């Protein structure tokens, strides 16, 4: 096969056919470490965002009026090793962060590699190639001679003629004009030479292990250089070392081994009827043989589009993602200006008039199709006349499927045809044109004349509705492996990285909403475990009677967890013993004024302040010492100060003798260690046994004072718990800390808990901290829930709560389709294998439907679930990624780019060792 590349200079491609193309990558994402990334779009978007995206695509199409660009939507293979490398980005090696021993994140990476091994994974990439025209370049006699020589050089075995500096400069200026026209539309960047070469390699290796796009994104190879005033490029002949055969023989279908043994396999080109194979009309695929093996691919041309389609169902290319196999598409565009298109419409109208006159002479009269055609032409003429910048899009669309065998390829082609047919699109797989349609998917090639019969005519806005220029993503570019994207038919990993959100000026706080048993606490535990395993710290306030978070911490973070049980009083949370200097005095005084219900500016408040200051100044400061100081003051003071000291000492004795306050006043207990950065990765504070006053009591002091002693002690102890969480979270901005608050309604029912949530949401980002909150209703997340950048919505059967959840995600709460999805489509009760489904929104405002996976790590699986009767001491078998996505049988291929994947795996382990 001959490659159409003559020279490559940056993103400019000189074709052997004499044309010059500028190749751009659309939606490129972050281009370098620390680079800014564009706002990406999820599968589920609000109507306003969809309209904005449609306007941008329409602008791009109209800005290229008069040109003939070509759009490539290519599915780049993803190797599990790539996911592993993304999981360790920003992770410090074990020797620096955890001392000697194995890094705790290694288990997670290995579990992810085991889960994804053998899965067919890909990511959608978009490329735009625009032919360039230059007055000084294309018309220069030496440029024309060089194009002609390129055709002869290949046959003579000689290198193509170099390109002069003048021509390179001229086409670069032409490319700048194209970029200026594209500005303001979609995000793009010039393609790299290695990426242009990858596009050809990808086309030739469909159905096989292909070179990874990740390597091409960072490669500096394949580009030409200007030397002595001319452009010299490396040889691209090796790219064409492949054999293309339409309807090639598949050993599995044609019993080629038996035919070879009988000597009946002839030389290539022997008549098909002399071989024991099917008719070529049934062998509508392209066999490509290269040095890596034999692959099969089928090219389908879009032959007919529906005359009218609703805006919600017009996203043809987005529907391709629903298939359980990847689909490439190539769209060759001819953009006709409005005036020229109107001339063509008038010509067609005149032809219709002539046909109508001819039919009038027949007894049957004029057929209804003529009336419909006249109506369509009239509507087209009116829309073209609406604005002078309108263009008519004449497109030839080629869809490509592939497989390791001809049978798999043929089955996928039939499935794609059926999907398009259900939407009133007709796709054909023409026999004899497979190679011609394949040629269209290569950069730098001319459009074969035989494919013009598949041209479709649309207005720019109508064509933009098909969604060819848009991609959908969910999650973050790197971080922890959370699960898979359920809006994609193939296995597409979803990753989130809450710890890196403050580094990109985003909030690291997350809110999770859903019914009981919908998976909120499992998702919280997975994220909290990933935070500490990646080098951060997690602080969890656990109110559950079974102390589920304490159980999880003891197994998941064994040896690195600290449990603070408020009811069992195993450690002390005495503020004077936990905090040094002014911080300890501040928290101690605030706790006592809250517990005793006294005014800070009263006589009792002044006496209490003096007692705290004196106790803190001693050699062994403690809350017990405050009681002793008050007793001493009551013995030596006189008057009102004596009475106040005696009264305060008596009240403190009442509180101190209660078991719930023992962890504050018992000097024999060891104090809590707040040096989390060096000794503890996970701190769990269990509040079982603590009671709080009802929320209505906080608005009426007289009602609050009448509450039981246990409720008043619980409120004051909660203040200290919040102080511990706040102090630890804001201690070291260099180390990310996440505060986990499950069932948030319990905490926000008090002023102290509400203040903690408020401070974490407003000040957490600048201190390298975030809030991870779970609730049954979005309203329970509080009035500041809009500051949460990460949002997840699980199954919510109540329609009113579901509406509030959708509004929390930024979606339309009145959308019936979304309401059905949330109320009955996410983790339906009783359906095995459907657990862990969420709608997830991340800081880039991309919302999608995901399935969360529990890694097959014993220390995690033994205690992460809370389903009664399902807690086991051995890890349950985890389904594969494809089985969890849906129960349909799915053909899989071997892991793509096996050698590259193995080297990536080795690099992961070496980095974390």
Name each region found by the language model.
Residues 1-452:
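Extended, folded cores of ATP/NTP-driven motor/assembly subunits in large transport
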Residues 14-19, 47-62, 479-564:
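Glycine-rich phosphate-binding loop of nucleotide-binding enzymes
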Residues 50, 73-98, 522-617:
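Switch/coupling segment of Walker-type NTPase motor domains
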Residues 51-65, 439-493, 575-762, 769, ...:
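P-loop NTPase motor domains
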Residues 109, 115, 201-294, 300, ...:
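Phosphate-binding P-loop/Walker A region and its immediate neighborhood
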Residues 115-116, 580, 584-625, 782-913:
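P-loop NTPase motor core of the ASCE superfamily
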Residues 492, 498-518, 522-528, 541-548, ...:
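Conserved P-loop NTPase motor cores
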């Amino acid at each position: 096969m001959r490659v159409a590349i003559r020279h490559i200079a940056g993103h400019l491609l000189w074709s052997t056919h004499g044309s010059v193309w500028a190749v751009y990558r659309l939606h490129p994402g972050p281009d370098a470490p620390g680079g800014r990334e564009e706002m990406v779009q999820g599968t589920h978007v609000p109507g306003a965002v969809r309209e904005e995206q449609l306007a941008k695509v329409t602008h791009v199409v109209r800005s290229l009026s008069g040109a003939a660009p070509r759009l490539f939507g290519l599915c780049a293979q993803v190797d599990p090793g790539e996911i592993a490398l993304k999981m360790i980005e920003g992770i410090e090696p074990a020797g620096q962060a955890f001392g000697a021993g194995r890094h705790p994140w290694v288990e997670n990476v290995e579990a992810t590699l085991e889960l994804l091994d053998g899965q067919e994974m890909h990511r959608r990439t978009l490329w735009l190639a625009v032919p360039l025209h230059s007055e000084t370049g294309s018309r220069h006699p030496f440029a024309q001679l060089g194009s002609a020589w390129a055709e002869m050089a290949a046959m003579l075995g000689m290198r193509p003629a170099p390109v002069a500096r003048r021509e390179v400069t001229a086409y670069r200026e032409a490319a700048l004009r194209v970029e200026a026209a594209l500005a303001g539309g979609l995000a793009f960047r010039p393609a790299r030479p290695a990426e242009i070469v990858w596009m050809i390699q990808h086309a030739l290796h469909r159905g096989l292990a292909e070179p990874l796009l990740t390597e091409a994104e960072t490669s500096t190879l394949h580009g030409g250089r200007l030397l002595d005033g001319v452009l010299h490029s490396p040889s691209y002949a090796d790219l064409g070392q492949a054999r293309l055969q339409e309807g090639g023989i598949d050993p599995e279908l044609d019993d080629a081994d038996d035919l070879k043994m009988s000597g009946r396999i002839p030389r290539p080109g022997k008549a098909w009827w002399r071989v024991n194979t099917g008719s070529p009309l049934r062998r509508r695929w392209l066999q490509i043989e290269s040095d890596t093996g034999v692959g099969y691919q089928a090219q389908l041309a879009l032959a007919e589009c529906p005359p009218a389609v609703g805006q919600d169902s017009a996203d043809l290319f987005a529907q391709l993602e629903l298939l359980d196999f990847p689909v490439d598409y190539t769209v060759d565009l001819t953009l006709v200006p409005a005036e020229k298109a109107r001339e063509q419409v008038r010509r067609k109208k005149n032809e219709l008039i002539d046909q109508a006159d001819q039919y009038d002479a027949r007894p049957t009269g004029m057929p209804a199709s003529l009336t419909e055609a006249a109506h369509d032409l009239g509507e087209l003429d009116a829309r073209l006349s609406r604005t002078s910048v309108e263009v008519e899009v004449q497109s030839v669309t080629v869809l490509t499927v592939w497989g390791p065998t001809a049978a798999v390829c043929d089955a996928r082609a039939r499935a794609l045809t059926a999907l398009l047919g259900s939407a009133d699109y007709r796709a054909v797989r023409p026999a004899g044109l497979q190679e011609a349609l394949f040629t269209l998917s290569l950069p730098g090639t001319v459009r074969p004349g035989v494919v013009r019969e598949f041209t479709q005519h649309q207005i720019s806005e109508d064509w933009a509705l098909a969604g060819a220029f848009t991609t959908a993503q969910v999650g973050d570019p790197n971080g922890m492996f959370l699960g898979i994207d359920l809006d994609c038919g193939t296995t597409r990993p979803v990753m989130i990285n809450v710890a890196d959100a403050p580094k990109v000026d985003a909030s690291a706080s997350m809110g999770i909403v859903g019914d009981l048993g919908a998976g909120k606490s499992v998702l919280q535990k997975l994220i909290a475990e990933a935070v500490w395993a990646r080098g951060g710290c997690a602080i969890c306030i656990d109110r559950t009677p079974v102390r589920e978070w304490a159980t999880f911490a003891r197994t998941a973070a064994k040896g690195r967890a600290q449990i603070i049980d408020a009811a069992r009083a195993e450690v002390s949370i005495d503020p004077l013993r936990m905090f040094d200097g002014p911080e300890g005095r501040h928290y101690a005084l605030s706790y006592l004024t809250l517990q005793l219900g006294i005014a800070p500016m009263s006589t009792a408040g002044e006496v209490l302040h003096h007692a705290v200051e004196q106790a803190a100044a001693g050699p062994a400061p403690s809350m017990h010492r405050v009681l002793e100081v008050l007793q001493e003051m009551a013995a030596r003071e006189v008057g009102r100060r004596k009475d106040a000291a005696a009264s305060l000492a008596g009240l403190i004795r009442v509180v101190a003798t209660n078991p719930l306050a023992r962890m504050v006043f018992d000097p024999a207990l060891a104090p809590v260690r707040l040096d989390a950065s060096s000794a503890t990765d996970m701190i769990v504070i269990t509040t079982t046994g603590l009671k709080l006053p009802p929320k209505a009591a906080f608005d009426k002091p007289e009602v609050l004072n009448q509450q039981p002693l246990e409720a008043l002690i619980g409120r004051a102890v909660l203040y200290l718990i919040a102080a511990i969480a706040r102090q630890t979270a804001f201690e070291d901005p260099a180390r990310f800390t996440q505060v986990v608050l499950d069932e948030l309604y319990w905490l926000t029912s008090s002023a102290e808990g509400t203040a903690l949530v408020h401070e974490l949401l407003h000040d957490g980002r600048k201190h390298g901290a975030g809030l991870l909150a779970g609730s049954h209703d979005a309203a329970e997340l509080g009035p500041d829930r809009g500051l949460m950048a990460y949002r997840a919505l699980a199954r919510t059967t109540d329609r009113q709560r579901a509406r509030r959840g959708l509004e929390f995600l930024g979606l339309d709460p009145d959308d019936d389709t979304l309401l059905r999805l949330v109320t009955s489509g996410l983790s339906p009760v009783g359906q095995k294998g459907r657990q862990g489904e969420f709608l997830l929104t991340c800081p880039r405002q991309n919302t999608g439907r995901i399935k969360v996976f529990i890694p097959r790590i014993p220390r995690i699986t033994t205690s992460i679930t809370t389903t009664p009767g399902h807690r086991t001491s051995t890890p349950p078998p985890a389904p594969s990624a494809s089985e969890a996505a849906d129960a349909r049988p799915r053909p899989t291929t071997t892991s793509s780019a096996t050698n590259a994947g193995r080297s990536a795996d080795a690099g992961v382990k070496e980095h974390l060792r």
